[in-house]
Amino acid sequence: MSQGNLYILSAPSGAGKSSLISALLASDSSTQKMVSVSHTTRAPRPGEVEGVHYYFVSKEEFESLIEQDLFLEYAKVFGGNYYGTSLPAIEENLAKGIDVFLDIDWQGAQQIRKKVPSVKSIFILPPSLPELERRLIGRGQDSEEVIAERMSKAMSEISHYDEYDYVIVNDDFEKTLKDLQSILQSERLTKDYQQKQNAMLIQQLLAK
């Protein structure tokens, strides 16, 4: 059975990451793909489904999982809630040949690289700061103050782009989607990947 690849996908708010992930999962059925579902201690919001949006657990359960070293990465955010990525769930899906995407920020990415050096990371850039602000305003969800905060945070996040393996400018949605698909395909053609997937064939070809 093929081994799946683990990917980190990061971007500032408004860069189009969520839409790109949804489109990527719906495309190219030749490879299985999924977004990792995180654990959190915060209460479910209206419309959120257990196991689809998050795994909702108590603070005590979460801290027990931390003690057992069962998180690939985790963080305690403003307000006191925990968020984390389950290591056993990731390993199980990768073993099934599923490419797993982690929708996390640069801080989570740094944690994961220490535990899984083979992870591939992708950063999505906006075409410009004015365009990023226009997209945030166009959502119609946030006040001017919140948008200003998001823009400030975006500039901080963008400063970490050079820590990533791949960088894509999302100035054309369809082109960016194709770029993402190309990354997935190319990662399955690397020497390291093929040595694992076709070990027996390579051994036979090299046998005297």
From Swiss-Prot:
Keywords from the named record: ATP-binding, Cytoplasm, Kinase, Nucleotide-binding, Transferase
CC terms in the record's Gene Ontology section: cytosol
Primary enzyme class: transferase
Signal peptide per UniProt: none
Record's keyword annotation contains Cytoplasm: yes
Positions bound to ATP: A11, P12, S13, G14, A15, G16, K17, S18
Family according to the record: Belongs to the guanylate kinase family.
Descriptive protein name: Guanylate kinase
Gene expressing this chain: gmk
